A protein has these predicted regions:
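FabD-like malonyl-/acyl-CoA
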Residues: 1-137, 260-282
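Alpha/beta catalytic cores of group-transfer enzymes, especially the acyltransferase/condensing modules
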Residues: 9-11, 35-37, 74, 97-241
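Short, flexible loop segments at the rims of nucleotide/cofactor-binding pockets, characterized by
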Residues: 61, 236-242, 334
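Flexible, low-complexity segments
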Residues: 64-69, 73-83, 240-314
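A short beta-strand micro-motif
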Residues: 125-127, 352-358
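Mixed-charge, Lys/Arg-rich low-complexity intrinsically disordered regions
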Residues: 320-354
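Basic/aromatic-rich interaction segments and small domains that mediate binding to polyanionic partners
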Residues: 356-395
């Protein structure tokens, strides 16, 4: 069996959709008319630096994802058995399943992005090396039950959402529990109770939209199960304030039998998440049943680095950065893809390596080994900065 999955916000990058806009000019013109600007110009050149703004990001990703699916059908015509998308990507899954047309889907996404961009006073953070159960426990112990779980991305990658001051207060509690806390650059508390007012506004356009029956089963974010008859409108409304149950989604699909996943659209974030979820999959849990709550397999809460970076601490590397091998690694860094970059860095540079960056004035020291954040970003945590740097932005101090 085959499942096509579509990524959501965070996967965007300048240059996405190259060749697709010219290959599908009719859809591109429709998108330009609905949006009021050139989606091709936004995606390929982004002259006004708007691509990372929510109201522009979401329509751009929707269009590129949709054109990617159309190209897939044009090239080989292989129909999937299931469809799923992460947050925004769910709109592409519904469009691919025939539930909604390209135009109506884009109109919904355009309005969704506009409304979400207006959200204020909210914050989000990714929690690594922490299970859902432990996350809820820590929030309760810290008297921070005002914070919601926004994304269950993998058994040990959770995203929390709430008022900015509450999210900031949560950081020391997670770090004390040896979890990694990564504040996210968002203006709103997406996928939390604080989006309820936004839901009311979004409901106006959703209820005016006609939805058809899917010709392929689509897995809903809010349940991690296939859509039932008549659920589309309410699920899309509720999605704004509900948790994205991505782990449950993949667990359910794995329980259907031998499953092949293919990510369509921008990047491979979901592909990497699926690899990690598979490692925690236990067929005996039978997540195909609505009564069963999937849970991580043995050892999946033990090491964020092992889970995210597919690497290990090299404890016998004593030299800091003076060897010829180290210098050669530095010279080759930009030639490696993110996974290889992480693996090579960890072979040569131990925790505590002194580094410099063009984006920071003083010398920094690594606090962790390198790892993949969100499946695509090679990064390392800095001790005296209390944040992450992309590995391509740092170099060993001389």
């Amino acid at each position: 069996m085959k499942t096509y999955v579509f990524p959501g916000q965070g996967s965007q990058r300048k240059g996405m959709g190259e060749n697709l806009f010219d290959e599908f000019p009719d859809q591109t013109k429709i998108a330009d008319r609905i949006l009021g600007y050139s989606v091709k110009e936004l995606c390929l050149r982004d002259p006004d630096h708007k691509l990372n703004q929510t109201q522009y990001t979401q329509p751009a990703l929707y269009v590129v994802n949709a054109l990617s699916y159309q190209k897939k059908m044009k090239d080989d015509g292989i129909q999937p058995d299931f469809l799923a998308g992460h947050s925004l990507g769910e709109y592409n899954a519904l469009q691919a399943a025939g539930v909604i047309g390209f135009e109506d889907g884009l109109k919904l996404v355009k309005r969704r992005g506009e409304l979400m961009s207006h959200a204020r006073n909210g914050g989000m953070a990714a929690i690594l090396n922490c299970s859902e159960k432990l996350t809820r426990q820590l929030l309760k112990e810290a008297n921070l039950t005002t914070i919601d779980i926004a994304n269950l991305n993998s058994p040990s990658q959770i995203v929390i959402s709430g008022l900015t001051e509450d999210v900031n207060r949560a950081q020391p509690y997670f770090e004390k529990a040896n979890a990694m806390f990564i504040p996210l650059n968002t203006s709103g508390a997406f996928h939390s109770r604080y989006m309820k007012e936004t839901e009311k506004e979004f409901e106006k356009i959703v209820t005016e939209t006609n939805f058809s029956k899917p010709h392929v089963e689509v897995i809903a974010n809010v349940t991690g199960r296939p859509y039932k008859s008549g659920e589309v409108s309410q699920n899309l409304i509720n999605q704004l304030s509900s948790c994205v149950r991505w782990t449950d989604t993949i667990m359910y699909l794995l329980a259907q039998g031998e499953m092949e996943f293919e990510e369509l659209g921008v990047g491979d974030v979901l592909t990497k998440l699926i690899v990690w979820i598979k490692k925690g999959y236990d067929p005996e849990m039978n997540p195909s049943s609505d009564q069963v709550e999937p849970k991580p397999g043995p050892g999946k809460e033990q090491s964020t680095v092992a889970t995210l970076g597919n690497s290990k601490v090299v404890s016998d590397v004593k030299s800091n950065n003076s060897s010829p091998e180290t210098r050669r690694v530095g010279q080759k860094i930009e030639e490696l893809d993110s996974m290889k970059l992480v693996e090579q860095w960890n072979k040569v540079y131990p925790i505590g390596t002194k580094v410099t960056s063009d984006f920071y004035d003083t010398e920094l020291e690594t606090r962790t080994e390198a790892m993949l954040l969100f499946g695509h970003r090679a990064a390392v945590y800095m001790k005296n900065y209390n944040g992450y740097f992309d590995l391509r932005e740092v170099r060993p101090a001389v």
